[in-house]
Curated annotation (Swiss-Prot):
It holds the Pfam family Peptidase_M20. Signal peptide: none annotated. This is Succinyl-diaminopimelate desuccinylase. Zn(2+) 1 binds at residues 66, 99, 162. The lineage of its organism: Bacteria, Pseudomonadati, Pseudomonadota, Gammaproteobacteria, Enterobacterales. Its cofactor is Zn(2+); Co(2+). The gene is dapE. Binds 2 Zn(2+) or Co(2+) ions per subunit. It comes from Photorhabdus laumondii subsp. laumondii (strain DSM 15139 / CIP 105565 / TT01) (Photorhabdus luminescens subsp. laumondii). GO terms for biological process: diaminopimelate biosynthetic process; L-arginine biosynthetic process; lysine biosynthetic process via diaminopimelate.
Length: 375
């Protein structure tokens, strides 16, 4: 007997949807949702396909995810072709199996089963799907959220299918994420010959003490939900490539992953104070990739915990660890946001895979969340 979750996951994996190219994945999902009475609104922006689908009225529970995947890399290194889904020893192999086409299949089948059992359900069940999460994330969820907010759409709960599990299905869910703020700093000096330093001004020498101060700064203590804010230097570039030329400029890129104890404005102000105290001639560009967000225990978190406990026999750890996700955009709508998906140990790797049994169980967990919140 075949499993609809696995069949749909395989169908999605067969589409080589390298970000931001959807390659027809959303058409497959939409066909399933239309069959059970969902209203579909396609929302393309730029090079990205998105859709918003909903059924029912009232408090809204949305399932969110992305159809795009990262490139497979050297396909000769794969045990099985990355876009030919293969099941071996209970594992489903293929690019996107864990991140996150397996979750998408589990969501769709959960919705089909939920609607079949509760055709006149209370509340509204919705899907927010994009093909621009793995790359630039500029024409995907962020644009859909902007459009929905502009017309005062209501979103109460959102479950994102990102692969959150660590060692066994459902052992960890993300109920928040740190903010991400990047600085592109250029320190200006005067180019010259290394033999005549008095006729030049070496920007590398000037910036190093300031960077050391930034590295040594204790930004905050964190709190019960978030670790302390982290600042990391990512890139430094200067010089002409010649050993005898003092460079005229040095570019430094550094990133903050920050907790709810700080705002991005406070970080910017503190950084610029340090730079000015070191008498640097500089320009700086700031890129805010996302604000920190947190969903404390409440209806959605409680429903997810209970559903995992029912099907797995244990309760998950709530965590805000890891990088950013599209949850940072959805949280702007005032929704409670939680991320729950399969194990993440093989995501973006050669031989990406997920347990077929886990996907089937994940679909049941998703369905149980629906039943608790909008039945």
């Amino acid at each position: 007997m075949t499993c609809p979750v696995i069949e749909l996951a395989q169908q999605l994996i067969r589409q080589p949807s390298i970000s931001p190219d959807d390659k027809g994945c959303q058409d497959i999902m939409i066909a399933h949702l239309q069959t059970i009475g969902f209203t579909i609104e396609r929302m393309p922006f730029g090079d990205t396909n998105n859709f918003w689908a909903y059924r029912g009225i009232g408090p809204t529970l949305a399932f969110a995810g992305h159809t795009d995947v990262v490139p497979a890399g050297d396909e000769s290194q794969w045990e099985y072709p990355p876009f030919e889904p293969t099941i071996r020893n209970g594992m489903l192999y293929g690019r996107g199996a864990a991140d996150m086409k397996g979750s998408l299949a589990a969501m769709i089948v959960a919705a089909e089963r939920f609607v079949a059992a509760h055709p006149n359900h209370n509340g509204r069940l919705a899907f927010l799907i994009t093909s621009d999460e793995e790359a630039k994330a500029t024409h995907g969820t962020v644009k859909v959220v902007e459009a929905l907010m502009s017309r005062n759409e209501r979103l109460d709960y959102c479950l994102i299918g990102e692969p959150s599990s660590q060692h066994r299905l459902g052992d960890m869910v993300k109920n928040g994420r740190r903010g991400s703020l990047t600085a592109n700093l250029t320190v200006h000096g005067i180019q010259g010959h290394v033999a005549y330093p008095h006729l030049a001004d070496n920007p590398i020498h000037r910036v190093l003490p300031a960077l050391q101060t930034l590295v040594n700064t204790h930004w905050d203590e964190g709190n019960e939900f978030f670790p302390a804010t982290s600042m990391q230097i990512a890139n430094i570039h200067a010089g002409t490539g010649s050993h005898n030329v003092i460079p005229g400029n040095v570019q430094v890129q550094f990133n903050f992953r920050f907790s709810t104890e700080l705002t991005d404005s406070q970080i910017r102000e503190q950084v610029e104070t340090i730079l000015k105290n070191h008498n640097l001639n500089y320009t700086i560009e700031w890129i805010l990739a996302g604000q920190p967000f947190l969903t404390a225990k409440g209806e959605l978190v409680n429903a997810v915990i209970q559903s995992i406990d029912q099907y797995c026999g244990y309760q998950p750890e709530l965590s805000t660890s890891g990088g950013t996700s599209d949850g940072r955009f959805i949280a702007q709508m005032g929704a409670q946001v939680v991320e729950l998906g399969p194990l993440n140990s093989t995501i973006h790797k050669v031989n990406e895979s997920v347990s077929a049994a886990d996907l089937q169980q994940l679909s049941r967990i998703y369905q149980r969340v629906m039943e608790q919140l909008i039945q």
